């Protein structure tokens, strides 16, 4: 198959290299900076092995990148999805499948609006890998796998064929969900990150500096866990009134095998793949301040949490914790 990866971030590197290294597919990249990429992409895996994948092409031109692709996979932050869909739509083959590596930042809502009504769409509930770029365009770390991935597919005559192809590419079992709501509404990053950000800086004032940068997960507090659980409880009320199969989006406690805020905090502090990840901050001459340009702010509030909040308002479901945290983060979007 011919696969085009759109986006040169952490996930774009690892997904492209992982698929290309298998030697079964032609993998190309659509990126704003093709001149910074090598055709040989090295991926370092958590078990200590490394493997290299050869890219068939690296393009900034959408026509060159997607016109012969069987699968187009967006590995993009929420703010880049609409722009990229508009960029590629005229050059997509009618039978091409267009998808997103994670769907909680509005992929399906935007793709259904912008692309042909017959275009095959797919999207994952959670990212397949935990990924970090080591050397841009050349090397990246695959820091963690998922035991199983959950996928929604729309407009496909044979969804099972696409599911099986993606499972083979990602070397991970994939289960099909009933509809796109089940991947678009997530209690992962869109709730997880804002809960911790509010816990860290809910009382932050302009000009306030900190002496150090805390670890985002390894110092996770019980207060952050309780906020996360409250947001999840509100989301579960929304899911109950949508055409979503019960259990398709497990509760936070079920997913993390926890029983309360204290055990959830312990679990999040202990996850190996999360170790070493620092809170999004930047240095100033007086200390450290929150980095409002980080994807935690630029993606999880306006493209993750906002979708959940808007649907809850449409369904007249109270969401006091989600509202509180969303409204706290809203002023920082302009920064």
Locate predicted features:
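Substrate/ligand-engaging "lid" and interaction regions
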Residues: 134-231
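NAD(P)+-binding Rossmann beta1-loop-alpha1 motif at the extreme N-terminus of oxidoreductases
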Residues: 1-52, 56, 64-66
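NAD(P)-dependent Rossmann-like dehydrogenase/reductase catalytic/cofactor-binding core
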Residues: 206-212, 218, 225-335
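Rossmann-like NAD(P)(H) cofactor-binding subdomain of soluble oxidoreductases
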Residues: 73-74, 78-140
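Conserved beta-strand termini and adjacent loop/short-helix elements that scaffold enzyme active sites
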Residues: 30-32, 61, 124-126, 177-179, ...
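Short beta-strand/turn micro-motifs composed of small residues
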Residues: 7, 31, 76, 102, ...
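An anion/phosphate-binding loop that grips the pyrophosphate of nucleotide cofactors and donors
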Residues: 69
